[in-house]
Amino acid sequence: MKLASRKTATADVTRRQRSAHSSKEALYWIGPAALVILLIFGYSVVSVLISSFRYDGDWVGLENFEIVITDPIFLTALKHNGLLLLAVPILIILAFILAVTLFETRRGMRFYRSAIFLPYILPIPVVAVVFGQIYQLNGALNIFLRSIGLEPLAQDWLGDPSIALGTMSSVIIWKEVGFGVILMLAHIISLPNETYEAARIDGAGFWRTHLSITRPAILNTIVFYGVIEAITMVSWVFNYVYVMSNGLGGPGNATMVSELYIYRAAFQNKAPELAAAAAVFLFVATLILMVAFFRIQRRSIAGTFNK
């Protein structure tokens, strides 16, 4: 018995030594590349931060920030980013519904899963160009509506300031929902079947089962997806807006977002210092938003599992 224990202990020590050796070897390979990336990223961040306090080479303190945060166009851009955040709950709900539906649809699940995920892997500029044509005044959508007798519903989807931002958000939702479906579906498939079988025996229906069992079980995945999409809406929609509005954020700044504002300040208005100040402001605002989001979701998760 003692001999067996010694052999087990020796094997554990050997395993730990091999693991430590593998970790060191991996660090040797990854370290140089990681260091280069870190230096480049750090240099870029420091350069932007310093530029935000300068103008034409002179130190101006917070003057650039004052100009930016009092610029009506920048405030409009921030408001539009905030409105795009309203798409996050829609994405979460749609992804959850599609994920549980695919989970219950055993036949053809692979095909449907691929079809739903396909938009997510398409390049954003390609998606924006295609939908830009579809949503034109004489585009495919309006042609279809007129052909089925719904001409009153035909709109200038990208030319009407009141609906242009909503139109673009529909494109973002179409592209991003597949990512959430795959994340949630992968987690659902890993859950034990015994729980679902017990729920069926108790007479629980489709939605009761998934709202009472599936939703709490995959809440961490839902939170992760929500955070990723919130970051997307705040700081990753430039390509959609630039392509679909021809780089103008129009009509009449109706689709102006913070990223496009920074781009235009830096490259069109030749004011890189103002662009740097706007970028720093956006970074800090995004960081605060993410911290608040994580805290709220942590409390939600704790409340769910303490019930």
Which residues does each predicted region cover?
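A structural signal for multi-pass alpha-helical bundles of membrane permease subunits
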Residues: 22-307
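Short, Lys/Arg-rich, polar N-terminal cytosolic tail immediately upstream
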Residues: 1-22
